[in-house]
Amino acid sequence: MKEVKEALFMNKGEGESSYAQNSSFTQTVTSMTMPVLENAVETLFSKDFHLLQALNAVDLGCAAGPTTFTVISTIKRMMEKKCRELNCQTLELQVYLNDLPGNDFNTLFKGLPSKVVGNKCEEVSCYVVGVPGSFHGRLFPRNSLHLVHSCYSVHWLTQAPKGLTSKEGLALNKGKIYISKTSPPVVREAYLSQFHEDFTMFLNSRSQEVVPNGCMVLILRGRLSSDPSDMGSCFTWELLAVAIAELVSQGLIDEDKLDTFNVPSYFPSLEEVKDIVERNGSFTIDHMEGFELDSPEMQENDKWVRGEKFATVARAFTEPIISNQFGHEIMDKLYEKFTHIVVSDFEAKIPKITSIILVLSKIVG
Protein backbone atom coordinates (compact mmCIF):
# COMPACT_ATOMS: atom_id res chain seq x y z
CA MET A 1 0.00 0.00 0.00
CA LYS A 2 1.27 3.47 -0.88
CA GLU A 3 1.94 6.19 1.67
CA VAL A 4 -0.70 8.89 2.06
CA LYS A 5 1.31 11.47 0.12
CA GLU A 6 1.45 9.05 -2.84
CA ALA A 7 -2.23 8.02 -2.74
CA LEU A 8 -3.95 11.26 -1.78
CA PHE A 9 -5.30 12.99 -4.86
CA MET A 10 -8.62 13.53 -6.59
CA ASN A 11 -9.83 11.24 -9.39
CA LYS A 12 -7.92 12.08 -12.55
CA GLY A 13 -8.96 12.84 -16.12
CA GLU A 14 -12.27 14.22 -17.31
CA GLY A 15 -14.49 11.13 -17.07
CA GLU A 16 -17.81 10.71 -15.27
CA SER A 17 -16.27 10.19 -11.82
CA SER A 18 -13.33 12.60 -12.28
CA TYR A 19 -12.80 15.53 -9.96
CA ALA A 20 -12.75 17.86 -12.96
CA GLN A 21 -16.38 16.89 -13.67
CA ASN A 22 -17.49 16.79 -10.02
CA SER A 23 -16.03 19.88 -8.38
CA SER A 24 -19.05 22.17 -8.77
CA PHE A 25 -19.59 22.41 -5.02
CA THR A 26 -15.98 23.43 -4.41
CA GLN A 27 -16.42 25.98 -7.19
CA THR A 28 -19.55 27.30 -5.46
CA VAL A 29 -17.70 27.66 -2.16
CA THR A 30 -14.81 29.41 -3.90
CA SER A 31 -17.15 31.82 -5.67
CA MET A 32 -18.96 32.60 -2.41
CA THR A 33 -15.69 33.44 -0.69
CA MET A 34 -14.26 35.55 -3.53
CA PRO A 35 -15.17 38.82 -1.74
CA VAL A 36 -12.82 37.74 1.05
CA LEU A 37 -10.01 37.10 -1.44
CA GLU A 38 -10.73 40.41 -3.14
CA ASN A 39 -10.47 42.18 0.20
CA ALA A 40 -7.17 40.41 0.89
CA VAL A 41 -5.71 41.77 -2.36
CA GLU A 42 -7.06 45.24 -1.49
CA THR A 43 -5.33 44.99 1.88
CA LEU A 44 -2.01 44.03 0.30
CA PHE A 45 -2.14 47.12 -1.91
CA SER A 46 -2.94 49.29 1.10
CA LYS A 47 0.35 48.08 2.58
CA ASP A 48 2.33 49.37 -0.42
CA PHE A 49 2.64 45.96 -2.06
CA HIS A 50 1.86 47.70 -5.37
CA LEU A 51 5.37 49.13 -5.24
CA LEU A 52 6.66 45.65 -6.00
CA GLN A 53 7.45 44.65 -9.57
CA ALA A 54 5.77 41.27 -9.10
CA LEU A 55 3.30 39.72 -6.69
CA ASN A 56 3.83 36.05 -5.83
CA ALA A 57 0.71 34.03 -5.04
CA VAL A 58 0.10 30.31 -4.53
CA ASP A 59 -2.97 28.09 -4.57
CA LEU A 60 -2.17 25.19 -2.23
CA GLY A 61 -3.90 21.88 -2.90
CA CYS A 62 -5.19 23.17 -6.23
CA ALA A 63 -6.40 19.76 -7.56
CA ALA A 64 -7.46 19.74 -11.23
CA GLY A 65 -10.86 21.39 -11.38
CA PRO A 66 -11.78 24.90 -12.55
CA THR A 67 -11.71 26.31 -9.01
CA THR A 68 -8.10 27.40 -9.19
CA PHE A 69 -8.79 29.34 -12.42
CA THR A 70 -11.39 31.40 -10.56
CA VAL A 71 -8.78 32.16 -7.91
CA ILE A 72 -6.18 33.26 -10.47
CA SER A 73 -8.68 35.40 -12.39
CA THR A 74 -9.87 37.10 -9.20
CA ILE A 75 -6.37 37.99 -8.05
CA LYS A 76 -5.44 39.29 -11.50
CA ARG A 77 -8.66 41.30 -11.85
CA MET A 78 -8.18 42.93 -8.44
CA MET A 79 -4.57 43.79 -9.22
CA GLU A 80 -5.66 45.47 -12.47
CA LYS A 81 -8.34 47.39 -10.59
CA LYS A 82 -5.86 48.63 -7.98
CA CYS A 83 -3.31 49.54 -10.66
CA ARG A 84 -5.88 51.76 -12.35
CA GLU A 85 -6.91 53.35 -9.04
CA LEU A 86 -3.35 54.01 -7.91
CA ASN A 87 -1.96 54.77 -11.37
CA CYS A 88 0.91 52.43 -10.62
CA GLN A 89 3.41 50.75 -12.92
CA THR A 90 2.68 47.57 -14.82
CA LEU A 91 2.76 44.62 -12.44
CA GLU A 92 3.54 40.97 -12.94
CA LEU A 93 1.65 38.19 -11.19
CA GLN A 94 3.44 34.91 -10.53
CA VAL A 95 1.01 32.14 -9.53
CA TYR A 96 2.18 28.78 -8.23
CA LEU A 97 -0.26 25.86 -8.43
CA ASN A 98 0.60 23.31 -5.77
CA ASP A 99 -0.59 19.82 -4.97
CA LEU A 100 0.88 16.43 -4.17
CA PRO A 101 2.81 14.73 -7.01
CA GLY A 102 -0.11 12.38 -7.74
CA ASN A 103 -2.33 15.30 -8.73
CA ASP A 104 -3.54 15.46 -12.33
CA PHE A 105 -1.41 18.42 -13.38
CA ASN A 106 -1.89 17.52 -17.06
CA THR A 107 -5.66 18.05 -16.93
CA LEU A 108 -5.10 21.16 -14.80
CA PHE A 109 -2.82 22.91 -17.27
CA LYS A 110 -4.78 21.75 -20.31
CA GLY A 111 -7.79 23.57 -18.89
CA LEU A 112 -5.93 26.77 -18.02
CA PRO A 113 -7.76 29.59 -19.87
CA SER A 114 -5.50 31.49 -22.28
CA LYS A 115 -6.95 34.80 -21.10
CA VAL A 116 -5.51 34.18 -17.64
CA VAL A 117 -1.87 33.77 -18.64
CA GLY A 118 0.60 35.51 -20.91
CA ASN A 119 2.49 38.77 -20.91
CA LYS A 120 0.34 40.97 -23.17
CA CYS A 121 -2.14 42.21 -20.60
CA GLU A 122 -2.24 45.98 -20.41
CA GLU A 123 -1.81 46.22 -16.66
CA VAL A 124 -0.95 42.81 -15.15
CA SER A 125 1.06 40.06 -16.80
CA CYS A 126 0.37 36.63 -15.32
CA TYR A 127 2.66 33.60 -15.23
CA VAL A 128 1.57 30.20 -13.90
CA VAL A 129 3.75 27.27 -12.85
CA GLY A 130 3.08 23.92 -11.17
CA VAL A 131 4.74 23.05 -7.87
CA PRO A 132 4.31 19.40 -6.82
CA GLY A 133 4.94 18.64 -3.16
CA SER A 134 3.39 18.54 0.30
CA PHE A 135 2.28 21.89 1.69
CA HIS A 136 2.91 20.58 5.19
CA GLY A 137 6.59 21.22 4.52
CA ARG A 138 8.60 23.99 2.89
CA LEU A 139 7.94 24.61 -0.81
CA PHE A 140 9.30 28.13 -1.41
CA PRO A 141 12.25 30.35 -0.40
CA ARG A 142 12.04 32.51 2.70
CA ASN A 143 9.97 35.69 2.44
CA SER A 144 8.95 34.98 -1.14
CA LEU A 145 5.13 34.73 -1.00
CA HIS A 146 2.75 37.67 -0.75
CA LEU A 147 -0.56 35.81 -0.96
CA VAL A 148 -1.51 32.22 -0.12
CA HIS A 149 -4.86 30.67 -1.04
CA SER A 150 -6.18 27.20 -0.34
CA CYS A 151 -9.66 25.71 -0.74
CA TYR A 152 -10.70 22.35 0.69
CA SER A 153 -7.17 21.04 1.23
CA VAL A 154 -5.89 21.90 4.69
CA HIS A 155 -8.24 19.43 6.42
CA TRP A 156 -6.35 16.53 4.80
CA LEU A 157 -3.72 14.97 7.07
CA THR A 158 -0.20 13.73 6.38
CA GLN A 159 -1.15 10.29 7.66
CA ALA A 160 -3.85 8.38 9.49
CA PRO A 161 -3.81 9.35 13.18
CA LYS A 162 -1.26 7.55 15.32
CA GLY A 163 -2.25 5.44 18.32
CA LEU A 164 -5.36 3.74 16.93
CA THR A 165 -4.09 0.25 17.76
CA SER A 166 -4.02 -1.16 21.29
CA LYS A 167 -0.90 -2.62 22.92
CA GLU A 168 -2.30 -6.03 22.03
CA GLY A 169 -2.49 -5.01 18.38
CA LEU A 170 -6.27 -4.64 18.28
CA ALA A 171 -7.94 -1.94 16.19
CA LEU A 172 -9.49 0.76 18.40
CA ASN A 173 -11.84 2.03 15.69
CA LYS A 174 -13.05 -1.38 14.54
CA GLY A 175 -15.57 -1.37 11.71
CA LYS A 176 -15.21 2.37 11.08
CA ILE A 177 -12.98 4.47 8.84
CA TYR A 178 -13.44 7.85 10.56
CA ILE A 179 -14.77 9.25 13.83
CA SER A 180 -18.27 7.97 14.55
CA LYS A 181 -20.77 7.99 17.39
CA THR A 182 -19.48 4.58 18.48
CA SER A 183 -15.78 5.49 18.32
CA PRO A 184 -14.07 5.55 21.74
CA PRO A 185 -12.70 8.90 23.00
CA VAL A 186 -9.14 7.87 22.10
CA VAL A 187 -10.09 7.96 18.41
CA ARG A 188 -11.38 11.52 18.63
CA GLU A 189 -8.29 12.56 20.59
CA ALA A 190 -5.96 10.92 18.05
CA TYR A 191 -7.60 12.72 15.13
CA LEU A 192 -7.42 16.12 16.83
CA SER A 193 -3.81 15.49 17.82
CA GLN A 194 -2.86 14.62 14.24
CA PHE A 195 -4.62 17.69 12.86
CA HIS A 196 -2.90 19.86 15.49
CA GLU A 197 0.49 18.44 14.49
CA ASP A 198 -0.12 18.81 10.74
CA PHE A 199 -1.73 22.25 10.79
CA THR A 200 1.10 23.48 13.02
CA MET A 201 3.62 22.18 10.45
CA PHE A 202 1.63 23.97 7.75
CA LEU A 203 1.73 27.26 9.67
CA ASN A 204 5.42 26.89 10.50
CA SER A 205 6.28 26.34 6.83
CA ARG A 206 4.20 29.29 5.65
CA SER A 207 5.58 31.54 8.38
CA GLN A 208 9.00 31.20 6.76
CA GLU A 209 7.77 31.61 3.20
CA VAL A 210 5.26 34.47 3.55
CA VAL A 211 6.61 38.02 3.71
CA PRO A 212 5.76 40.21 6.73
CA ASN A 213 2.20 41.56 6.31
CA GLY A 214 1.59 38.90 3.66
CA CYS A 215 -1.80 37.22 3.69
CA MET A 216 -3.30 33.73 3.69
CA VAL A 217 -6.91 32.91 2.73
CA LEU A 218 -7.72 29.35 3.79
CA ILE A 219 -11.02 27.55 3.21
CA LEU A 220 -11.41 24.10 4.71
CA ARG A 221 -14.07 21.61 5.62
CA GLY A 222 -15.01 21.95 9.25
CA ARG A 223 -17.88 21.90 11.69
CA LEU A 224 -19.91 24.31 13.81
CA SER A 225 -20.58 21.68 16.48
CA SER A 226 -18.14 20.78 19.24
CA ASP A 227 -18.87 17.11 18.48
CA PRO A 228 -16.52 15.69 15.79
CA SER A 229 -18.92 12.80 15.21
CA ASP A 230 -21.91 14.91 14.20
CA MET A 231 -23.48 13.67 10.98
CA GLY A 232 -22.50 16.76 9.01
CA SER A 233 -18.84 15.96 9.63
CA CYS A 234 -18.80 12.21 9.12
CA PHE A 235 -21.72 11.53 6.74
CA THR A 236 -19.74 10.39 3.69
CA TRP A 237 -17.20 8.38 5.67
CA GLU A 238 -19.91 6.77 7.81
CA LEU A 239 -21.82 5.56 4.75
CA LEU A 240 -18.66 4.36 3.03
CA ALA A 241 -17.80 2.33 6.15
CA VAL A 242 -21.26 0.72 5.98
CA ALA A 243 -20.74 -0.10 2.30
CA ILE A 244 -17.29 -1.57 2.97
CA ALA A 245 -18.67 -3.62 5.88
CA GLU A 246 -21.32 -5.12 3.60
CA LEU A 247 -18.63 -6.21 1.14
CA VAL A 248 -16.70 -7.68 4.08
CA SER A 249 -19.78 -9.73 5.01
CA GLN A 250 -19.90 -11.00 1.41
CA GLY A 251 -16.28 -12.09 1.59
CA LEU A 252 -15.16 -9.55 -1.00
CA ILE A 253 -12.96 -7.53 1.38
CA ASP A 254 -10.84 -8.78 4.29
CA GLU A 255 -12.23 -7.59 7.61
CA ASP A 256 -8.75 -6.67 8.79
CA LYS A 257 -8.43 -4.16 5.94
CA LEU A 258 -11.53 -2.36 7.22
CA ASP A 259 -10.52 -2.44 10.87
CA THR A 260 -7.03 -1.06 10.22
CA PHE A 261 -8.03 1.76 7.87
CA ASN A 262 -8.64 5.30 9.12
CA VAL A 263 -9.17 8.19 6.72
CA PRO A 264 -6.36 10.81 6.82
CA SER A 265 -8.71 13.78 7.13
CA TYR A 266 -10.19 15.83 9.96
CA PHE A 267 -12.94 18.44 9.98
CA PRO A 268 -12.05 20.82 12.84
CA SER A 269 -14.23 23.21 14.77
CA LEU A 270 -13.71 26.98 14.68
CA GLU A 271 -12.38 26.85 18.24
CA GLU A 272 -9.81 24.18 17.38
CA VAL A 273 -8.51 26.14 14.38
CA LYS A 274 -8.35 29.37 16.39
CA ASP A 275 -6.45 27.67 19.21
CA ILE A 276 -3.80 26.23 16.89
CA VAL A 277 -3.23 29.55 15.08
CA GLU A 278 -2.91 31.44 18.35
CA ARG A 279 -0.55 28.86 19.83
CA ASN A 280 1.62 29.04 16.73
CA GLY A 281 1.96 32.81 17.04
CA SER A 282 3.18 33.55 13.50
CA PHE A 283 -0.07 34.98 12.13
CA THR A 284 -2.91 37.19 13.29
CA ILE A 285 -6.49 36.18 12.54
CA ASP A 286 -8.07 38.95 10.46
CA HIS A 287 -11.27 37.07 9.72
CA MET A 288 -12.74 33.69 10.60
CA GLU A 289 -16.22 32.28 10.14
CA GLY A 290 -18.06 29.05 9.54
CA PHE A 291 -20.94 28.67 7.12
CA GLU A 292 -23.23 25.88 5.95
CA LEU A 293 -24.48 25.05 2.47
CA ASP A 294 -26.84 22.40 1.21
CA SER A 295 -25.27 19.64 -0.80
CA PRO A 296 -26.18 20.44 -4.44
CA GLU A 297 -27.70 16.96 -4.83
CA MET A 298 -30.54 18.01 -2.51
CA GLN A 299 -31.97 20.04 -5.39
CA GLU A 300 -32.92 16.77 -7.10
CA ASN A 301 -36.44 15.52 -6.36
CA ASP A 302 -35.88 11.95 -7.49
CA LYS A 303 -34.16 10.01 -4.70
CA TRP A 304 -32.23 7.79 -7.10
CA VAL A 305 -30.90 10.73 -9.10
CA ARG A 306 -29.98 12.41 -5.82
CA GLY A 307 -28.23 9.30 -4.52
CA GLU A 308 -26.36 8.62 -7.74
CA LYS A 309 -25.12 12.21 -8.01
CA PHE A 310 -24.02 12.26 -4.38
CA ALA A 311 -22.17 8.96 -4.83
CA THR A 312 -20.45 10.16 -8.02
CA VAL A 313 -19.23 13.35 -6.36
CA ALA A 314 -18.08 11.40 -3.29
CA ARG A 315 -16.23 8.95 -5.50
CA ALA A 316 -14.33 11.78 -7.19
CA PHE A 317 -12.55 12.74 -3.97
CA THR A 318 -12.56 9.47 -1.98
CA GLU A 319 -11.74 6.76 -4.52
CA PRO A 320 -7.94 7.15 -4.73
CA ILE A 321 -7.39 6.88 -0.97
CA ILE A 322 -10.05 4.15 -0.59
CA SER A 323 -8.76 2.05 -3.50
CA ASN A 324 -5.23 2.30 -2.11
CA GLN A 325 -6.43 0.31 0.91
CA PHE A 326 -9.07 -1.99 -0.56
CA GLY A 327 -8.02 -2.46 -4.19
CA HIS A 328 -9.07 -0.96 -7.53
CA GLU A 329 -10.96 -4.07 -8.63
CA ILE A 330 -13.67 -3.64 -5.98
CA MET A 331 -14.39 0.06 -6.51
CA ASP A 332 -17.34 -0.19 -8.91
CA LYS A 333 -19.14 -2.63 -6.62
CA LEU A 334 -18.31 -0.53 -3.54
CA TYR A 335 -19.70 2.74 -4.93
CA GLU A 336 -22.76 0.94 -6.31
CA LYS A 337 -23.41 -0.30 -2.77
CA PHE A 338 -22.71 3.19 -1.45
CA THR A 339 -25.35 4.64 -3.79
CA HIS A 340 -27.97 2.16 -2.55
CA ILE A 341 -27.19 3.07 1.06
CA VAL A 342 -27.53 6.80 0.38
CA VAL A 343 -30.90 6.25 -1.28
CA SER A 344 -32.37 3.74 1.18
CA ASP A 345 -31.10 5.07 4.50
CA PHE A 346 -30.73 8.80 3.94
CA GLU A 347 -33.22 9.68 1.20
CA ALA A 348 -34.89 12.34 3.34
CA LYS A 349 -31.96 14.64 3.99
CA ILE A 350 -28.27 14.82 3.14
CA PRO A 351 -26.68 16.98 5.87
CA LYS A 352 -25.49 20.50 5.13
CA ILE A 353 -21.79 20.87 4.39
CA THR A 354 -19.86 23.11 6.76
CA SER A 355 -16.88 25.19 5.67
CA ILE A 356 -14.49 27.43 7.58
CA ILE A 357 -12.87 30.46 5.98
CA LEU A 358 -9.80 31.89 7.65
CA VAL A 359 -7.83 35.02 6.76
CA LEU A 360 -4.39 35.29 8.35
CA SER A 361 -1.73 38.01 8.19
CA LYS A 362 1.96 37.33 8.79
CA ILE A 363 3.13 39.10 11.93
CA VAL A 364 5.93 41.61 11.39
CA GLY A 365 9.05 41.01 13.43
UniProtKB/Swiss-Prot annotation:
<comment type="similarity">
    <text>Belongs to the methyltransferase superfamily. Type-7 methyltransferase family.</text>
</comment>
<keyword id="KW-0489">Methyltransferase</keyword>
<keyword id="KW-0460">Magnesium</keyword>
<feature type="site" description="Involved in substrate discrimination">
    <location>
        <position position="265"/>
    </location>
</feature>
<feature type="binding site">
    <location>
        <position position="152"/>
    </location>
    <ligand>
        <name>caffeine</name>
    </ligand>
</feature>
<feature type="binding site">
    <location>
        <position position="134"/>
    </location>
    <ligand>
        <name>S-adenosyl-L-homocysteine</name>
    </ligand>
</feature>
<feature type="binding site">
    <location>
        <position position="135"/>
    </location>
    <ligand>
        <name>S-adenosyl-L-homocysteine</name>
    </ligand>
</feature>
<feature type="site" description="Involved in substrate discrimination">
    <location>
        <position position="221"/>
    </location>
</feature>
<feature type="binding site">
    <location>
        <position position="62"/>
    </location>
    <ligand>
        <name>S-adenosyl-L-homocysteine</name>
    </ligand>
</feature>
<dbReference type="GO" id="GO:0046872">
    <property type="term" value="F:metal ion binding"/>
</dbReference>
<feature type="binding site">
    <location>
        <position position="155"/>
    </location>
    <ligand>
        <name>caffeine</name>
    </ligand>
</feature>
<feature type="binding site">
    <location>
        <position position="259"/>
    </location>
    <ligand>
        <name>Mg(2+)</name>
    </ligand>
</feature>
<feature type="binding site">
    <location>
        <position position="173"/>
    </location>
    <ligand>
        <name>Mg(2+)</name>
    </ligand>
</feature>
<feature type="binding site">
    <location>
        <position position="317"/>
    </location>
    <ligand>
        <name>caffeine</name>
    </ligand>
</feature>
<feature type="binding site">
    <location>
        <position position="26"/>
    </location>
    <ligand>
        <name>caffeine</name>
    </ligand>
</feature>
<feature type="binding site">
    <location>
        <position position="262"/>
    </location>
    <ligand>
        <name>Mg(2+)</name>
    </ligand>
</feature>
<feature type="site" description="Involved in substrate discrimination">
    <location>
        <position position="149"/>
    </location>
</feature>
<comment type="function">
    <text>May be involved in the biosynthesis of caffeine. Catalyzes the conversion of 7-methylxanthine (7mX) to theobromine and of theobromine to caffeine. Has 1-N-methylation activity.</text>
</comment>
<dbReference type="InterPro" id="IPR029063">
    <property type="entry name" value="SAM-dependent_MTases_sf"/>
</dbReference>
<dbReference type="InterPro" id="IPR042086">
    <property type="entry name" value="MeTrfase_capping"/>
</dbReference>
<keyword id="KW-0479">Metal-binding</keyword>
<keyword id="KW-0017">Alkaloid metabolism</keyword>
<comment type="pathway">
    <text>Alkaloid biosynthesis.</text>
</comment>
<dbReference type="GO" id="GO:0102741">
    <property type="term" value="F:caffeine synthase activity"/>
</dbReference>
<protein>
    <recommendedName>
        <fullName>Probable caffeine synthase 2</fullName>
        <ecNumber>2.1.1.160</ecNumber>
    </recommendedName>
</protein>
<feature type="binding site">
    <location>
        <position position="99"/>
    </location>
    <ligand>
        <name>S-adenosyl-L-homocysteine</name>
    </ligand>
</feature>
<keyword id="KW-0808">Transferase</keyword>
<feature type="binding site">
    <location>
        <position position="156"/>
    </location>
    <ligand>
        <name>caffeine</name>
    </ligand>
</feature>
<dbReference type="GO" id="GO:0032259">
    <property type="term" value="P:methylation"/>
</dbReference>
<feature type="site" description="Involved in substrate discrimination">
    <location>
        <position position="328"/>
    </location>
</feature>
<feature type="binding site">
    <location>
        <position position="221"/>
    </location>
    <ligand>
        <name>caffeine</name>
    </ligand>
</feature>
<feature type="binding site">
    <location>
        <position position="100"/>
    </location>
    <ligand>
        <name>S-adenosyl-L-homocysteine</name>
    </ligand>
</feature>
<feature type="binding site">
    <location>
        <position position="261"/>
    </location>
    <ligand>
        <name>Mg(2+)</name>
    </ligand>
</feature>
<dbReference type="Pfam" id="PF03492">
    <property type="entry name" value="Methyltransf_7"/>
</dbReference>
<dbReference type="InterPro" id="IPR005299">
    <property type="entry name" value="MeTrfase_7"/>
</dbReference>
<keyword id="KW-0949">S-adenosyl-L-methionine</keyword>
<dbReference type="GO" id="GO:0009820">
    <property type="term" value="P:alkaloid metabolic process"/>
</dbReference>
<feature type="binding site">
    <location>
        <position position="19"/>
    </location>
    <ligand>
        <name>S-adenosyl-L-homocysteine</name>
    </ligand>
</feature>
<feature type="site" description="Involved in substrate discrimination">
    <location>
        <position position="313"/>
    </location>
</feature>
